[in-house]
């Protein structure tokens, strides 16, 4: 499996060399004195048509206010020449401020489940407000809004789905966890879950608990667990061409 993961990463290396951060414009959203910095990729295509919207949530190590760090992992795979030609999309990569999180949850002691808190985190509130602003101001296909994230962003992906179950057309949570008691409301959303079996930072039990709960609720999520892989399962996830093809086929 390590060889397969290495192959997937190497296969994307040439394309990533062409995907420059400058393709993402620098933006910020301000609401009631709070600021959410984000980068935006707009496809080099017909600006008169509508495009899918991809929301990419980074991990805890990329928090800050430089509006750069959130491009470090994963999201650049959406900006390769090959992907932009095959799957033109508007991609939003927000940056969570220091000492804050995308999700607002309380983990259970058994490290298998999360409990969704009543109110969203401030970054999540700002993100959802930004999405609603963009879908009225930009050529977005509201039947094809996708969300994905890694580590802290994986938790954030589940958080967004469970709070706003009618907003998203598909999701790809990578090494994250959610509130299993709320999966009935999101069982209709196509999902592909990724996890490293040896992850020391995000217990695989979280992903497995969500997989079990979703399946019991009648969902049919995709699930890829990399044996002998730790916390960097996103290297394989976002280099997986099958996942990319699958994601852009989804719609409400």
Each language-model region and where it sits:
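A domain-start/cap signature at the N-terminus of enzymes
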Residues: 17-53, 89, 123-129, 148, ...
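Gly/Ser-rich "nucleophile elbow"/oxyanion-hole loop immediately N-terminal to the catalytic nucleophile
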Residues: 44-49, 104-150
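Active-site machinery of serine-nucleophile hydrolases
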Residues: 60-124
């Amino acid at each position: 499996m390590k060889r397969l993961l290495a192959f997937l990463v190497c296969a994307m290396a040439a394309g990533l060399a062409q995907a420059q951060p400058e393709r993402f414009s620098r933006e910020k959203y301000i609401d009631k004195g709070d600021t959410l910095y984000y980068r935006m990729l707009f496809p080099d295509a017909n600006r008169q048509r509508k495009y899918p919207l991809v929301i990419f949530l980074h991990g805890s190590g990329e928090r800050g206010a430089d509006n750069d760090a959130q491009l470090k992992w994963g999201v650049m795979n959406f900006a390769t020449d090959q992907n932009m030609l095959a799957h033109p999309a508007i991609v939003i990569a927000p940056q969570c401020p220091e000492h804050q999180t995308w999700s607002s949850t309380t983990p259970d002691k058994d490290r298998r489940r999360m409990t969704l808190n009543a109110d969203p985190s401030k970054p999540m509130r700002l993100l959802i407000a930004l999405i609603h602003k963009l879908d009225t101001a930009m050529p977005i296909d509201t039947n094809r809004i996708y969300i994905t994230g890694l580590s802290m962003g994986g938790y954030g992906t589940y958080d967004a789905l469970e709070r706003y179950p009618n907003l998203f057309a598909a999701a790809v949570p990578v090494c994250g966890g959610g509130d299993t008691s709320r999966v009935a409301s999101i069982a209709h959303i196509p999902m592909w879950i990724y996890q490293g079996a040896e992850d020391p930072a995000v217990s695989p039990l979280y992903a497995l608990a969500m997989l079990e709960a979703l399946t019991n609720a009648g969902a049919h999520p995709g699930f890829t667990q990399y044996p002998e892989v730790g916390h960097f399962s996103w290297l394989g996830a976002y280099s997986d061409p099958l996942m990319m093809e699958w994601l852009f086929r989804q719609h409400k």
